[in-house]
Amino acid sequence: MNHTSDSPPQSSVLAWLQGQPVLTAIGLALGTSLGASLARFSYALFVPSMRDDLGWLYFTLGAMNTAHAMGYLVGALTLSWVITRFSSARSFVIGGVLTSIFLGLCGLFIQPTAIGLLRFLSGFTSASVFAGGTVLIAQLASAHPKRSGLLLGIYYAGGGFGMIICALLVPLTLTLGAEWGMAHPWQLGWYVLGATGLLMTFLMWKPSASVPVSPPRKTTGDSTAISRYAKIAAGYFCFGMGYIGYMTFIMAMLRELGWQDTSLTAFYITMGVLGLFSAQIWAKALDTFKGGQCLAIINTLLAIACLIPGYFALTGSQASGMVIVVCLYISGAIFGACLATAVASTTAFIKHNLPQTQWVAAITVFTSIFATGQILGPALTGWISDNAGGLATGFIVSAAILFAGAWLAWLQKPFLAPSP
């Protein structure tokens, strides 16, 4: 027998996974696919159909993602308690089950209040998935320091994989829903995403259990003042506020520019593919930069990605159709390659500058700041788009916010982490 008397029956599987950090990171990355892509990013694929079907204003459509972000903020604020009470691995898996259920239930309603409530609940539970997974991947990366950047990159690249899954599933379900005569064809997509989320949760269960995590400790003297990393935190707030406008409304803007469903799907897949390979693109930078430089670079690139569609929505008649298409694909490629790494950059900053006993608390702070930015972003972009020149103006404002975030993050210098 290979098991000790107090080992669970599955300990051989878990022990094997503990010796396979890359495979473990891939399993954990499904949490990013679920908590970020299915729960949050997929909504952009529903926006054009829901707007056409329900006649909602951009403000109302944006408010659905604001509700999701509010739930995410509440989940982030309670994250330390949840992880202390249930452990990172359990909160990761339980959050995955609940998030999947709430996603599926979105297909049962057409009232904005009901859908908004479910978006709030899915945001609340997805915080345990995404941020809980962040704690797990930080522990895994700490145990394998020579591959730290790669492991962090793999985890956050799960968002790209999830985007590809969404791009393949949601348009297909919209077509099938229409062919089957459903009154609201987009509802089928929510059912399928819920089922997909449950499958992902099952697949990430064992990898999450294989990461050895000591219970988080809370002491009165073991803390680092937030002012020490206020600049990168402010830059991360701007990231949350700026990126979400693009993510919420890019498909609606492309539809306004005359793109058909096939082109929209190809564009979204492009973002997902670049996100999937962002681990290889950014792994060295995540290991090299100890301060806010990585986030500053990413915010700058994301701002450029926002400016491109904003510019062509205002002045597209001055360029040929092919030029517009190529530039928009460049925008999507930049956005996909940078999106997940912005989050990874803050995790890397925490790992580089804080002792392990402070990781949960610091991740909670960064997640809460990020979520606050996400609350403001979609509704602001939607309101501007309804009242001040359309989606183009909203995208330009998002770019300005991201440029400000880049400047703030650049000011952040590393500091010597005390011994754990």
Q: Language-model features: where?
A:
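Helix-to-loop junctions at the C-terminal end of transmembrane segments
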Residues: G75-S87, S278-G291, S385-D386
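A late C-terminal transmembrane helix in Major Facilitator Superfamily
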Residues: K351-A388
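Cytoplasmic helix-loop-helix junction between adjacent transmembrane helices
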Residues: L118-G158
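Conserved MFS/SLC helix-loop-helix module at the cytosolic interface between two early adjacent transmembrane helices
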Residues: V74-I110
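Paired small-residue
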Residues: F102, T113-S122, V326-I334
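C-terminal membrane-cytosol helix-exit motif in multi-pass small-molecule transporters
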Residues: V170-P171, G194-S214, L408-Q412
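Extracytoplasmic gate region of multi-pass secondary transporters
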Residues: Y43-A44, R228-I269, V273-L276
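C-terminal transmembrane helical hairpin of 12-TM major facilitator-type secondary transporters
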Residues: G292-T346
